[in-house]
């Protein structure tokens, strides 16, 4: 089971989250049949949203949209505060690597665009904010969003590593945030450690990458573990939800679908589950 560890420095001036999202991203790859670059881009977006959701209180729903003008199109993710996340990428078939190293490329194919966050607190007035994409690598764009939009200086590292068959090997990351009251001396120490930190891909290769991430963030500084939360890819779609969507079309449109197509098939964008509605099903909806 994937998990996210919340921590805070002994001084109370820094908080850090470290997470293992391997099964989450693996499930997303299997459901959407994504190729290498699309897998990494979608995976990074899911991890960013898992972090963002962990930062929320109450029963909120968080939508992250990474909207670029490159090959990927847009990437959409929806998370809740219970550790569930779902998502999809408009173009699942991007598969581009550096010839010399085999490194999967993301940034150049995200293009220019926006990192958008929509937080729905359940009150009917969702809060939307956005920042421009600064690199298209998603992790850097997420850190920029946190610093600029949420006014919290943040360092973020997240990645998805693939095996030789381009299947998800490991996925995860971290977020470090400066809290009010941090001294300049403390900030300088943490900045130095982040700058000298091994590459996120190297840390993810560790036997226990959550511990490796926390050790890299805190060094010898004492910190407290606040909580451990389970994470998973989970879609909340249902036949009932799509029945309600069909009802919004109106009886005339449903009759036309019944007469012309003799039924309907709806595919959930987030998990690719197919829902079949026969002529009899449509007739029942028409007569509802």
From Swiss-Prot:
<keyword id="KW-0862">Zinc</keyword>
<dbReference type="GO" id="GO:0042026">
    <property type="term" value="P:protein refolding"/>
</dbReference>
<feature type="disulfide bond" description="Redox-active">
    <location>
        <begin position="268"/>
        <end position="271"/>
    </location>
</feature>
<comment type="function">
    <text>Redox regulated molecular chaperone. Protects both thermally unfolding and oxidatively damaged proteins from irreversible aggregation. Plays an important role in the bacterial defense system toward oxidative stress.</text>
</comment>
<dbReference type="InterPro" id="IPR000397">
    <property type="entry name" value="Heat_shock_Hsp33"/>
</dbReference>
<feature type="disulfide bond" description="Redox-active">
    <location>
        <begin position="235"/>
        <end position="237"/>
    </location>
</feature>
<keyword id="KW-0143">Chaperone</keyword>
<dbReference type="GO" id="GO:0051082">
    <property type="term" value="F:unfolded protein binding"/>
</dbReference>
<dbReference type="InterPro" id="IPR016153">
    <property type="entry name" value="Heat_shock_Hsp33_N"/>
</dbReference>
<protein>
    <recommendedName>
        <fullName>33 kDa chaperonin</fullName>
    </recommendedName>
</protein>
<comment type="similarity">
    <text>Belongs to the HSP33 family.</text>
</comment>
<dbReference type="InterPro" id="IPR016154">
    <property type="entry name" value="Heat_shock_Hsp33_C"/>
</dbReference>
<dbReference type="Pfam" id="PF01430">
    <property type="entry name" value="HSP33"/>
</dbReference>
<dbReference type="GO" id="GO:0005737">
    <property type="term" value="C:cytoplasm"/>
</dbReference>
<keyword id="KW-1015">Disulfide bond</keyword>
<keyword id="KW-0676">Redox-active center</keyword>
<keyword id="KW-0963">Cytoplasm</keyword>
<dbReference type="GO" id="GO:0044183">
    <property type="term" value="F:protein folding chaperone"/>
</dbReference>
């Amino acid at each position: 089971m994937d998990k996210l560890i919340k921590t805070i420095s002994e001084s109370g001036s820094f908080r850090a989250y470290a997470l293992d999202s391997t099964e989450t991203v693996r499930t997303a790859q299997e459901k959407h049949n994504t190729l290498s670059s699309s897998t990494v881009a979608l995976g990074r977006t899911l991890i960013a949203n898992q972090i963002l959701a962990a930062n929320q209180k109450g029963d909120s729903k968080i939508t992250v949209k990474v909207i670029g003008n490159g090959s990927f199109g847009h990437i959409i993710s929806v998370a809740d505060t219970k550790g569930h996340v779902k998502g999809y990428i408009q173009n699942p078939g991007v598969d581009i690597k550096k010839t010399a190293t085999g490194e999967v490329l993301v940034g150049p194919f995200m293009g220019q665009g926006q990192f958008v966050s929509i937080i729905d607190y359940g009150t009917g007035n969702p809060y939307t904010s956005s920042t421009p994409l600064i690199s298209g690598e998603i992790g850097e764009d997420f850190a920029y969003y946190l610093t600029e939009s949420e006014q919290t200086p943040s360092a973020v590292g997240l990645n998805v590593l693939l095996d030789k068959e381009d299947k998800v090997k490991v996925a995860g990351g971290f977020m470090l945030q400066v809290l009010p009251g941090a001294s300049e001396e403390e900030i300088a120490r943490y900045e130095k450690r982040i700058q000298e930190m091994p590459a996120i891909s190297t840390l993810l290769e560790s036997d226990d990458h959550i511990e490796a991430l926390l050790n890299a963030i805190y060094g010898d500084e004492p910190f407290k573990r606040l909580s451990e939360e389970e994470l998973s890819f989970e879609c909340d779609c249902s036949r009932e939800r799509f029945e309600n969507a069909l009802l919004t079309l109106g009886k005339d449109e449903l009759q036309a679908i019944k007469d012309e197509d003799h039924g309907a098939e709806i595919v959930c964008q987030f998990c690719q589950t197919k829902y079949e509605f026969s002529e009899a099903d449509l007739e029942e909806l028409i007569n509802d």
